[in-house]
């Protein structure tokens, strides 16, 4: 009679081929169906408690991405609307770029803060203090790249208790799939989705 340990060993040995042939998500990739597109919603914001974040509109990032350059007319209009309504506007740069490198169409005006960081614009900057000092409760996050500065800064804002408005015509990446997955992630991720609203610039009301 075989001992219980031998029976267990035999059972485990039988499982090895099954485990080795189990498919990973990468193996299943071609068969995964994309989720339905998220809904873009109209948004009304209070200019007194809302800030517009213009992230990394500089040549090395925006200039290298045709989709970012294509977003500039909408971003220029949104920026002017924010300024007209007295909204707080903050800009960011990355790498070795400086405030004066920000593209002319969306360049900061005197008094508009510019922070320099990597993909999370709250990290090692005074952005959080700037927003808190002005009583900001909602941020409109725009810029490039969608999967870099936008995703990480928007997430950081949500985790700090702010509401996040994400106009999809104001975020850009090197390809459309990247923009798509960022939009999906922001309205499905735990702790972030409840604070995030997807919209487009023409649905924003001040």
Predicted stretch roles:
Residues 57, 91-94, 168:
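A cross-domain feature marking catalytic cores of carbohydrate-active enzymes
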Residues 53-55:
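Short hydrophobic beta-strand that contains or immediately precedes a catalytic carboxylate
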Residues 79-97:
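Von Willebrand factor
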Residues 17-21:
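N-terminal signal peptide c-region/cleavage motif recognized by signal peptidases
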Residues 65-82:
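…and closely analogous acidic/polar surface helices at protein-protein or active-site interfaces
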Residues 58-63:
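Short acidic, Gly/Ser-rich segments with clustered Asp/Glu that frequently serve as metal-coordination loops
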Residues 1-9:
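Bacterial N-terminal signal peptides that target proteins for export
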Residues 23-51, 97-206:
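Active-site-adjacent betaalpha module
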